[in-house]
A protein has these predicted regions:
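Asp-based, Mg2+/Mn2+-dependent phosphohydrolase catalytic module
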Residues: 1-5, 118-223
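N-terminal helical cap/lid subdomain that shapes the substrate entry/recognition surface
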Residues: 3-95
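Conserved phosphate-coupling serine/threonine residues in phosphotransfer and NTP-handling enzymes
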Residues: 15, 115-117
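Conserved SAM-binding loop
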Residues: 16, 46, 111, 168-169
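Anion (oxyanion) recognition and catalysis
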Residues: 32, 105, 180
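Short beta->alpha linker loops
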Residues: 48, 52, 92-96, 117-118, ...
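Structured helix-beta-strand junction loops
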Residues: 51, 107-108, 201
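Short, acidic loop-to-helix structural element flanking the phosphoryl-transfer center
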Residues: 83-113, 149
Length: 223
């Protein structure tokens, strides 16, 4: 029988962490080391953001005329970003985010914290938050800058959350778009680094995740 449980899926790496800036820094270093390939923000937005790593890199590699293989580079760049997230995640769970999670969970709404961090640092970072109605979901998305639409769906399925009764908490415009493609409503956390992206379609827009934004989300879910 299909789940009817209400839930919230938080893409921690972009909605809480400043993942967009971290990813840009990682990509810039990686491409420079790979073949002295430059990367600036307009180029990142034009060729990489909101696409699979492989598709975006293949498009950009044609422009810069490198002989490097996009498929291999995509795997390496995704792994490098996951490693960078793993390094900072244990220091990134602020009291305001704890309040966001516990406020929602206290109302019986499931909270799924999604991250690409490695198992050990993820467990260390989130263990104090894994109370009743809160779970951790790990997946390295093949998309640059946001989860792919089916990542949202898998996070719901793995944690017995009904997509029709769930809201995705995204940290970018492309995250909002992928949530829509997954058939989910979304709350967008507006980050200065990607504020230029299109947030059309977000059901809610907030500046951070806190007890106050949790109450807005609960009101939207009619809890």
């Amino acid at each position: 029988m299909a789940s009817t449980a209400k839930g919230v899926v938080v893409e921690f790496d972009f909605a809480v962490l400043n993942g967009a800036q971290l990813l840009f820094d990682v990509a810039q270093r990686y491409l420079q080391a790979l073949d002295k390939i430059g990367l600036d923000m307009p180029t990142e937005e034009k060729y990489l953001a909101g696409r699979s790593y492989e598709e975006g890199l293949a498009r950009y590699f044609k422009v810069v005329k490198t002989k490097k293989t996009a498929q291999k580079a995509a795997r390496e760049l995704a792994a490098a970003f996951a490693a960078a997230v793993s390094e900072v995640v244990t220091k990134s769970v602020a009291p305001s985010f704890r309040n966001f999670v516990t406020t929602i969970a206290a109302k019986g709404v499931k909270v799924v914290i999604a991250t690409r961090a490695a198992p050990e640092p993820a467990a260390e970072a989130f263990a104090p938050l894994l109370i009743e109605n809160v779970s951790l979901y790990r997946e390295v998305s093949p998309f640059y800058g946001c989860p792919r639409w089916d990542s949202w769906r898998r996070a719901c399925m793995a944690n017995d959350v009904a997509r029709a009764n769930a809201i995705a908490v995204a940290g970018s415009g492309c995250g909002v778009k992928s949530a829509l493609l997954a058939g989910m409503a979304s709350m967008a956390v507006m980050k200065a680094r990607v504020a230029h992206q299109d947030y059309t379609g977000a059901s809610l827009v907030v500046n951070d995740l806190s007890a106050a934004s949790a109450k807005k989300l609960l009101s939207y879910l009619q809890v």
